[in-house]
Amino acid sequence: MSDIETVSSFVEGAPPGELADVIADIKSLTLETNPDIVNSLTPAFEKYNEEQFVTVKLPGSSQPVIISSYNSLGDGRYFDVESSSSFTFDHTTQKASAVQSHVLEGAQADLVKSTLKSIGPYVDEHFANAAHGVYPIESDSKIAIVIVGNKYSPNNFWNGRWRSLYILDPSSGALEGSLKVDVHYYEDGNVRLLTNKPVSSTISSANGAGIVREISAMEKRYQEELNKGFVSLSEGAFKGLRRQLPVTRQKIEWDRVTSYRLGQDIGNGGSRR
């Protein structure tokens, strides 16, 4: 594996909200051997930004829009249906520029707009720091529905991201997708949760309200599965990692701690060797 491939894998595997830290580490590690290596990582940045559904605010707007392969126009330009605009996105700096008008037309335009109208309130209610997008794909034969929610808490040593992707075939009502959770906790350790849940369903009424209703039901079930999994881990595998201590259910009287056997062992540790 070449140096570029190795460093690219670091970029593509960066935890949520920590890409800048990864880049800083790469620069530090390659300062003497290859100080310009970051300039060669544009393909890795593009892959990361599109796969992670990175969000950006367009100039003059406070509303975040999603970067993904589903709303790519090629040559670094992307479009946003809700704002009827297209823009250039710099994958290295994660900045948007050159905003232009982009009016959605085509066979799925009405379905895309009705789905956008229905999914907005759902996302606002259930996700923090979230963005969503609905796009026509595959020669206007299907639509892609994308949701991303980010929660960054570096002061508490953790960051997290939820990603939902759904592909709807209006002709059959088939809805297929994946739900992904990525959480990184790094206080006095390094723990990362990565999940990928494939989902599928059939929409009897292919309209915005029906689509969002089914999405809500699938995501609720998955959230319940995750909660059960956390309880199982806490009571099972994680509990087994902890050193077992006897439970006396008695408060320690700290002013008398030396009278306890543990205190005696500590106090006389030197003479007992």
From Swiss-Prot:
Subcellular location: Cytoplasm, Cytoskeleton
Pfam families on file: F-actin_cap_A
Single GO BP term: barbed-end actin filament capping
Major localization class: cytoplasm
Any one Gene Ontology molecular-function term assigned to this protein's record: actin filament binding
Keyword annotations from UniProtKB, A to Z: Actin capping, Actin-binding, Cytoplasm, Cytoskeleton
GO cellular component term of the entry, any: F-actin capping protein complex
PANTHER family (UniProt xref): F-ACTIN-CAPPING PROTEIN SUBUNIT ALPHA
Role, per record: F-actin-capping proteins bind in a Ca(2+)-independent manner to the fast growing ends of actin filaments (barbed end) thereby blocking the exchange of subunits at these ends. Unlike other capping proteins (such as gelsolin and severin), these proteins do not sever actin filaments.
Quaternary assembly: Heterodimer of an alpha and a beta subunit.
Family to which the UniProt record says this protein belongs: Belongs to the F-actin-capping protein alpha subunit family.
Protein name: F-actin-capping protein subunit alpha
Gene that this polypeptide is encoded by: CAP1
